[in-house]
């Protein structure tokens, strides 16, 4: 890396999403000049707490809360213009300048009303057929990615050419309306409603459309530090997650390059975000899941103290013990440079903590999460018991001020996974962060 170029950091979730990436991205943008979303859509939900004020973001990079920081939506993101402007207007009402700082790749596929209709109708169809639901958010993410892979998607750049857009839309809508009405038993979507809304959005989007790949490469060469913000988590990755209970994009660090148009050599440090316990929204295997609905249980403690409800859907998150064998898999596929442990404070007051170090599977033991959902369903976790702590960790900003048992817990995670812990978050507040090694300064 030349001394004249910037240093770039990728932030990824290592579990099933909801690890607290938004807060850490916001915190790290103090050292960055640009923040990039590279996959997913408005199914992501990042919550930031700044000076006691809570802000929920779904599509716009978390760096928008730092004045002067440029924000980019890369080509790997599927874009709902309707939801984007809903989010922009909410931020502008709060006094945040957005439009002059947001750049959107013209190569982003568009999420249109029929994508959400397909998403919801398919889940209903699965349920009626007695098949377990995938657990989609119903936002149209999967169907939009399907159109992209099938090479029939309408992209942001198509909005600049109304006649071309109308022609492509008519063909696409005919296809999807056939599936909606003839296969899924859902109502058809009206062409004029979709087209008219898209044209209204086109006029608003044009000033923000950009060649994001070129702008990022130019910024890097000019010395800017960039931060690539992942959405969801590694175990929701379409290739490396608990398939088919996954999202429709690659959530791993390697996709930061493909999803934004930079070379992999521009990714200098990979920060894995992981909760001090595990949570999951929706269906799919979860080896260390606890009873999180019964008062008085550790799972209930995690659910209530951790306020475990989805930012995007409001659904309750399933809760369980920390899974170090799962984290080994995440470290492997992401090439993690370091870890940030979040929500350590949620474990305050638990007398004993169980740490999953591996699994029993079909009469054998393994120390890493298997690849297939069917295999994971058959896994019985192997636990190591550690002593908890009664002292409060809320707001602690120095590692040596943590309770002894909290430090031992963190050290054991490092030992099992082989990944150093460089940061610890002790509350949702931006400033309640322990820094052992800064990603923008680490070797």
UniProtKB/Swiss-Prot annotation:
The keyword GTP-binding applies. It is found in: Cytoplasm. SMART domains: Adenylsucc_synt. GO terms for biological process: 'de novo' AMP biosynthetic process; IMP metabolic process. It comes from the Bacteria. GO terms for cellular component: cytoplasm. GTP binds at residues 17-23, 45-47, 317, 343-345, 425-427. Mg(2+) binds at residues 18, 45. CDD domains: AdSS (cd03108). IMP binds at residues 18-21, 43-46, 137, 151, 232, 247, 315. The active site is at 18 (proton acceptor), 46 (proton donor). The keyword GTP-binding applies. Pfam families: Adenylsucc_synt. Keywords: Cytoplasm, GTP-binding, Ligase, Magnesium, Metal-binding, Nucleotide-binding, Purine biosynthesis. Pathway: Purine metabolism; AMP biosynthesis via de novo pathway; AMP from IMP: step 1/2. Its main location: cytoplasm. Substrate binds at residues 311-317. InterPro entries: Adenylosuccin_syn_GTP-bd, Adenylosuccin_syn_Lys_AS, Adenylosuccinate_synth_dom1, Adenylosuccinate_synth_dom2, Adenylosuccinate_synth_dom3, Adenylosuccinate_synthetase, P-loop_NTPase. Homodimer. PANTHER family: ADENYLOSUCCINATE SYNTHETASE (PTHR11846:SF0). Belongs to the adenylosuccinate synthetase family. Plays an important role in the de novo pathway of purine nucleotide biosynthesis. Catalyzes the first committed step in the biosynthesis of AMP from IMP. This is Adenylosuccinate synthetase. It comes from Variovorax paradoxus (strain S110).
């Amino acid at each position: 890396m030349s001394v004249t170029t910037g240093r770039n950091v990728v932030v990824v979730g290592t579990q099933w999403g909801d690890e607290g990436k938004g807060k850490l991205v916001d915190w790290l943008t103090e050292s960055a000049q640009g923040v990039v979303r590279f996959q997913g859509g408005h199914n992501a939900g990042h919550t930031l707490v700044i000076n006691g004020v809570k802000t929920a973001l779904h599509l716009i990079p978390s760096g928008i809360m730092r004045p002067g920081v440029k924000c980019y939506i890369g080509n790997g993101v599927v874009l709902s213009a309707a939801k984007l402007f809903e989010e922009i207007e909410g931020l502008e009402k709060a006094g945040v300048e957005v439009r002059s700082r947001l750049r959107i790749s013209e190569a982003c596929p568009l999420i249109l009303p029929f994508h959400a209709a397909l998403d919801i109708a398919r889940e209903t169809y699965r349920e009626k057929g007695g098949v377990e639901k995938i657990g989609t958010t119903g936002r149209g993410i999967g169907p939009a990615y399907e159109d992209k892979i099938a090479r029939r998607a309408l992209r942001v750049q198509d909005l600049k050419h109304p006649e071309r857009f109308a022609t492509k839309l008519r063909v696409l809508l005919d296809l999807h309306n056939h599936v909606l009405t003839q296969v899924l038993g859902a109502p058809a979507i009206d062409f004029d409603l979709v087209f008219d809304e898209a044209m209204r959005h086109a006029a608003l989007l044009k000033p923000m459309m950009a060649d994001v790949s070129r702008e990022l490469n130019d910024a890097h060469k000019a010395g800017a530090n960039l931060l690539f913000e992942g959405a969801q988590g590694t175990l929701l990755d379409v290739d490396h997650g608990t398939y088919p209970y996954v999202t429709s994009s690659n959530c791993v660090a390697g996709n930061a390059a493909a999803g934004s148009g930079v070379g992999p050599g521009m990714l200098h440090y990979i920060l894995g975000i992981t909760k001090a316990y595990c949570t999951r929204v929706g269906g799919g295997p979860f080896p260390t899941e606890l009873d999180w609905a019964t008062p008085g249980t550790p799972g209930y403690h995690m659910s209530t103290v951790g306020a475990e409800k989805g930012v995007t859907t409001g659904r309750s998150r399933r809760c369980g013990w920390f899974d170090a064998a799962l984290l080994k898999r995440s470290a492997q596929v992401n090439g993690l440079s370091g870890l940030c442990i979040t929500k350590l404070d949620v474990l305050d007051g638990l007398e004993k903590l169980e740490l999953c170090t591996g699994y029993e599977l079909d009469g054998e033991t393994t120390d890493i999460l298997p690849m297939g959902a069917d295999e994971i369903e058959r896994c019985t976790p192997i636990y190591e018991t550690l002593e908890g702590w009664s002292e409060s960790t809320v707001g602690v900003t120095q590692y040596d001020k943590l309770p002894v048992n909290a430090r031992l817990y963190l050290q054991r995670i490092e030992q099992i996974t082989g990944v150093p812990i460089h940061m610890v978050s002790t509350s949702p507040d931006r400033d309640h962060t322990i820094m052992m090694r800064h990603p923008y300064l680490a070797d």
